């Protein structure tokens, strides 16, 4: 966190990997990744998975799946607060799956931090959890849907049921409760992704 020199090294490696694979477009479901690539590698075309799903269409099995689900509140992640197309496309997807939802008073470009921003939970856990509870308490809905893994987990820690939009779309057996991933699990996921990229490079 804050180590720009190490960030530049990592980001340069990412660009080399993409170049080696001949990738001209990156699709991401992570709002932090979206803004990082858009900001520091503007020559790379970055596409939000949520916008892509609107373009190509949802699986038929997902359409209207949640028309009888209890209303949820929609939390917009901080990193893409100014990305109006993503805001629009996420709401389009919610309408397509039939989910009843309400907006937070402070949403879209005025959204509030979920409590995980800037790795606050690692540096000031008490303040992070206070913000998680504050944000979660700003709706009477028991469940809060977001399109960011960290945000969904934060809403759980804040006392509500945090739900990720992709689970609502692709996981028909989802139990309406975001499972928390520990630091080790998240690290392993990143390591596995790194291994897959290396394998792709070896085959090009």
Regions from the language model: what does each represent?
Residues 1-204:
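Iron-sulfur cluster-binding electron-transfer modules in prokaryotic oxidoreductases
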């Amino acid at each position: 966190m804050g180590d720009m020199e190490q960030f530049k090294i990592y980001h340069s490696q990412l660009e080399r990997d993409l170049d080696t694979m001949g990738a001209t477009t990156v699709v991401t479901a992570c709002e932090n990744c979206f803004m990082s690539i858009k900001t520091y590698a503007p020559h790379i075309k970055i596409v939000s998975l949520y916008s892509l799903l609107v373009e190509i269409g949802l699986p038929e099995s997902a359409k209207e799946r949640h028309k009888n689900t209890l209303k949820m509140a929609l939390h917009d992640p901080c990193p893409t607060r100014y990305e109006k197309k993503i805001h629009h496309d996420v709401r389009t997807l919610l309408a397509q799956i039939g989910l009843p939802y309400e907006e937070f008073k402070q949403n879209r470009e005025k959204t509030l931090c979920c409590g995980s921003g800037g790795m606050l939970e690692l540096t000031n856990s008490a303040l992070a959890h206070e913000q998680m509870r504050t944000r979660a308490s700003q709706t009477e809905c028991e469940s809060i849907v977001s399109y960011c893994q960290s945000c969904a987990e934060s809403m759980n820690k804040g006392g509500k049921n945090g739900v990720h939009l992709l689970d609502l779309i692709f996981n028909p057996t989802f139990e309406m409760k975001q499972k928390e991933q520990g630091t080790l699990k998240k690290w392993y996921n990143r390591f596995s992704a790194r291994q897959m990229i290396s394998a792709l490079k070896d085959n090009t």
